[in-house]
């Protein structure tokens, strides 16, 4: 079904495919169309995430853009006031889409810098005595794993306690 959806993308449209996902890589091998761009940490991505730095209150990363027509360029120091690898993935997909719509790099970077996230998606509730409390509405194992990975990236030597309500 997903392959058919991509194949039916009209010539004026583009699909943006997450190349870090092994299932997407398998699907790409079977596609007849080239009407898509890829993004992710994978070095073969058209929009490759690199130089990622995870901090307590923000994430900073660069983006190598390659094989987009005759364009190859680098966007440096993209600042997200969010933590977690999943947020970097989502931001990269948004950047790719915005660039394809003709938005300027500085406009995109400013919008991402000012974006504070979605409520209950790794929302910092409070900090007290070096203890941070986050609220997240992850509801399946993949999302829960992404949240824990994001928290671990910024709390490298800190204890993490998770409370889960099924």
Task: Give the label of every model feature segment.
Residues 133-139:
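Switch II (G3) loop of P-loop NTPases
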